[in-house]
Amino acid sequence: MSYDQAVLNRIWSETILTELHRFGVKHVCIAPGSRSTPLTLEAAEQPNFSIHTHFDERGLGFMALGLAKASQEPVAVIVTSGTAVANLLPAVAEAKLTGEKLVLLTADRPVELVGCGANQAINQLGIFSQHVSANLNLPSPSLNTPLNWLLTSVDEVMFNQQLHGSAVHINCAFPEPLYSDGEKSAYQSYLSSVEAWRKGGQTYTQRFVSPSFRDIPFCADRKGVVVIGSLSAEHAQEAKAFAQQMGWPVLADPQSGVSSDWSHYDLWLQQPKLASQLDECDLVLQFGSRIISKRLNQWINKQVSQSQQGRDVQYWFISPSLSRDNQTHLPQLHWVASPKSWVERVDVKSSSTQGWADGLLTDIAHVRAHISDEFLFSSASTLNEIALAADIEERTQSVDVFLGNSLFVRLVDMFGRLNTEVFTNRGASGIDGLFATASGVQRSRGKPLLMYIGDTSALYDLNSLALFSRNDLPSVLVVTNNDGGAIFDMLPVPQEHRTAYYQMPHGYQFEHAAKQFGLKYEKPTTLQMYQAMVADHLSSGQGTMLVEVQTPPSQAAELIKAFNKSLHASL
């Protein structure tokens, strides 16, 4: 039987995309390409999808990551064959570690055109290796392959994603012709096998996993410390409320978007007088993963390791992810649950240890005041990276925050306080794709956005500024330009090679980059100028403004060293 291959390609694409929508996909990200035409045209015709486009597949993948991160829903990505597929790998690797659900719909040449010199054909099978939770390599659409097989195959992949998170890869081999005016209605007999599904609204197959949740052997009379890692603001607030109910210290990572009276722990844990008081704990209760602070990670390791030396210190970890999050391989009780569901199962009683570490609060308040005096309120206060970090709480009211990687996120951990939704890429902690991810976050959330990104990270993802050029929502992109990798001033790299092989100074500024993409540009010279222009744009501005804050290369490291010395002397 002869058939129109282009129409059959469209039927398969429609079937796949309809099923993905029933699995919760609302956003589809598309890069240009001919081989992906069946998927692109079908996505464009489905009214239930929000379509996002970008000319760069690497940026497209990260934009999808941001959409998935903010929406907590799966996001589809459509690209053509060849290196277009390979360019998705960085975003896929990040999603593997942080759990965002991406559905990669990659167009491919049919099998007879792979490995024989055909144009734009590479071996795409297994290209994402262990960075995806499931693979589906589809044959070329054919009337000999029933649509109910296609649906159960897609369902298998999506059920796997529901259980394990991260990206899944569906490789679609489309033969030519790719374009046709033919009608799908001519293939009614082929479509009839899934007619009931087409008229319904449910996925073709359904699976239900019975929850298994043992009783929690919780002892409210332990001296607990609650650590809050990378969580949504809602979940972080639930964890914080639990800690406050127990009367225990709360050490909140910047990624949680919450703060507490116990903030700036990366600084005061370096002070033996203060750290020794917290060492009396016998339960570390951690909600969420990906702790930024090296000192906090070291403190957890030190405390829990003592349980192997006769001291009973327990380490409990609460996360909905099945993934192992235990970088120093401590004895750990992992509750696979959201903070809310876990807290609801705990029988919280009055605790005899309420306020057991409150003696620390006076000293911590002194640390906070010392930060303000040094970097915000002193007549000598200047515009530097630490001042930006210390000021962040005042800039982030009623806006979403995206923190880039490398130096600045660590400065926020040391000197900042937050009380808003915070987004990061702290899985692989790469410096690529950060503008694109932030754009995806804002597209999903629809709120004003304040982003902080380093100069090297900005250069790495410069073409993703195009994603902000057609944006009407107020956005401020703060580029901290210390002329290269100032993070290496904080690390024991060889002095003789630090500049040439680690920091790699570039001498670039960002005014013309902003102009090329039609963005507003400002370069403040004082902290007061910075505060005013950011506040004004986020409250009453429109579109995107890039704010460049230029500082000397080694300034941040020198200021931290001087501050720690001053703090130690004042305690």
UniProtKB/Swiss-Prot annotation:
The keyword Metal-binding applies. Pathway: Quinol/quinone metabolism; 1,4-dihydroxy-2-naphthoate biosynthesis; 1,4-dihydroxy-2-naphthoate from chorismate: step 2/7; Quinol/quinone metabolism; menaquinone biosynthesis. Keywords: Magnesium, Manganese, Menaquinone biosynthesis, Metal-binding, Thiamine pyrophosphate, Transferase. It comes from the Bacteria. Pfam families: TPP_enzyme_C, TPP_enzyme_M_2, TPP_enzyme_N. Binds 1 thiamine pyrophosphate per subunit. GO terms for biological process: menaquinone biosynthetic process. Its EC number is 2.2.1.9. It is an enzyme of class 2 (transferase). SUPFAM superfamilies: DHS-like NAD/FAD-binding domain, Thiamin diphosphate-binding fold (THDP-binding). One of its GO terms (molecular function) is thiamine pyrophosphate binding. Its cofactor is Mg(2+); Mn(2+); thiamine diphosphate. Coiled coil: none annotated. It catalyses: isochorismate + 2-oxoglutarate + H(+) = 5-enolpyruvoyl-6-hydroxy-2-succinyl-cyclohex-3-ene-1-carboxylate + CO2. Belongs to the TPP enzyme family. MenD subfamily. Catalyzes the thiamine diphosphate-dependent decarboxylation of 2-oxoglutarate and the subsequent addition of the resulting succinic semialdehyde-thiamine pyrophosphate anion to isochorismate to yield 2-succinyl-5-enolpyruvyl-6-hydroxy-3-cyclohexene-1-carboxylate (SEPHCHC). Homodimer. PANTHER family: 2-SUCCINYL-5-ENOLPYRUVYL-6-HYDROXY-3-CYCLOHEXENE-1-CARBOXYLATE SYNTHASE (PTHR42916), PROTEIN PHYLLO, CHLOROPLASTIC (PTHR42916:SF1). This is 2-succinyl-5-enolpyruvyl-6-hydroxy-3-cyclohexene-1-carboxylate synthase. It comes from Vibrio parahaemolyticus serotype O3:K6 (strain RIMD 2210633).
